[in-house]
């Protein structure tokens, strides 16, 4: 990097921060935080626990947004002032240090962009994730289990907690179906970008001839709904089946039919839960999963309508990403257009940067 490239980078980043400031209006956030502080000091505030909880979540969200904005604004100002000073004094050592820190400065601005993009109504919610293998038997089942591990590692990296709701092992390898709840700040905001079809190209470990195989798995992500959001489900529209649970490695195998499957006829959505030994609890969780899926489906319909009939880029039926392990190694996202060569790292859960690229690309459209 040289002086010209760094000065152009500063201009680009200043424009970004300026645009973000005009959207989030930091002064309005500060005013709102003062209002919340006054509310919290009122003796009657804590008498309504539910409302206090809602305002508490709002406070956390806008405090983080303001903090990210101030960090980005200050880092950019400091870099700009230091750059001007180093240039005037022909201080090559300081200039070199600024050039080396340029990626870190870009990451700070990206962090601000992402916190702004994750300010939607549902982004802060927990996420319910389901992975279903496509046609192809063992190949697809194995691919689904690789994706499952990738998301578990991602959650581990981000400090998200994971609760398995349903797990069905494949007959020879991998899994037939898995659903899990991801708990943590902005879990849905990040993972909603994973909605869609994931394609794998590799030399099959199950093919003695070592031929190249293509496998598909679908990932479905929906927000865990608060109890106060009402989704009407009519009894005539569903079928409830009960069966014996059979978890991974024989875990929680029950002699009673505690596992629950609900089929929703109008949409074709099927949800299953065998997380608990109690049929009653599994049924309640399965209904919660169904409501979340129906809610997500409605969000997609609204998005399609808002786009005047254009296809939504976050949808259960769209191929969103290709993972090629042979004849070369590359992961390419169809929405951001970005390609990554660190395939092993990605399959080990290092997907945050890739997801952020998708969120930024979709916002720019």
UniProtKB/Swiss-Prot annotation:
The gene is prfB. Signal peptide: none annotated. NCBIfam families: prfB. GO terms for molecular function: translation release factor activity, codon specific. Belongs to the prokaryotic/mitochondrial release factor family. The modification N5-methylglutamine is found at residue 251. Gene3D superfamilies: 3.30.160.20, 3.30.70.1660, Release factor. HAMAP family: Rel_fac_2. SMART domains: PCRF (SM00937). Methylated by PrmC. Methylation increases the termination efficiency of RF2. This is Peptide chain release factor 2. GO terms for cellular component: cytoplasm. Peptide chain release factor 2 directs the termination of translation in response to the peptide chain termination codons UGA and UAA. It is found in: Cytoplasm. Keywords: Cytoplasm, Methylation, Protein biosynthesis.
């Amino acid at each position: 990097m040289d002086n010209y490239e760094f000065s152009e980078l500063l201009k680009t980043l200043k424009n970004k921060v300026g645009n973000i400031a005009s959207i989030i209006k930091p002064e309005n956030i500060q005013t709102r935080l003062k209002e919340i502080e006054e509310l919290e000091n009122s003796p009657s505030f804590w008498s309504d626990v539910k409302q206090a909880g809602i305002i508490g979540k709002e406070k956390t969200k806008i405090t983080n947004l303001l903090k990210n904005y101030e960090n980005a604004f200050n880092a950019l100002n400091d870099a700009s002032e230091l750059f001007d000073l180093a240039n005037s004094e022909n201080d090559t050592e300081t200039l070199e240090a600024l050039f080396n820190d340029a990626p870190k400065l870009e990451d700070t601005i990206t962090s601000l962009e992402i916190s702004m993009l994750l300010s939607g109504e549902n982004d802060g919610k927990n996420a319910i994730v389901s992975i279903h293998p496509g046609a192809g038997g063992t190949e697809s089942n194995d691919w689904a289990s690789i994706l499952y591990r990738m998301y578990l590692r991602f959650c581990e990296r981000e400090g998200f907690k994971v609760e398995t709701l349903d797990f069905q092992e494949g007959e020879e390898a991998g899994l037939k179906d898995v659903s899990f709840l991801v708990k943590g700040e902005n879990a849905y905001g990040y993972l909603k970008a994973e909605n869609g079809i994931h394609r794998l190209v590799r030399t099959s470990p199950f093919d003695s001839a070592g031929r190249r195989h293509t496998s598909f798995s679908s990932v479905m992500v929906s927000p865990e709904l608060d109890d106060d959001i009402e989704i009407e489900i009519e009894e005539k529209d569903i079928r409830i089946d009960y069966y014996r649970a059979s978890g991974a490695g024989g875990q929680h195998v029950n002699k009673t039919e505690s596992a629950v499957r609900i089929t929703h006829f109008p949409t074709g959505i099927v949800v299953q839960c065998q997380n608990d030994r109690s049929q009653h609890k599994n049924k309640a969780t399965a209904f919660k999963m169904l409501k979340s899926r129906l809610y997500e489906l409605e969000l997609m319909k609204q998005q399609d309508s808002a786009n005047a009939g254009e296809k939504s880029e976050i949808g259960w039926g769209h191929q969103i990403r290709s993972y090629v392990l042979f004849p070369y190694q590359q992961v390419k996202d169809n929405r951001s257009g970005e390609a990554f060569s660190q395939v092993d790292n990605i399959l080990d859960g290092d997907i945050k940067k890739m997801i952020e690229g998708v969120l930024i690309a979709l916002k720019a459209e």
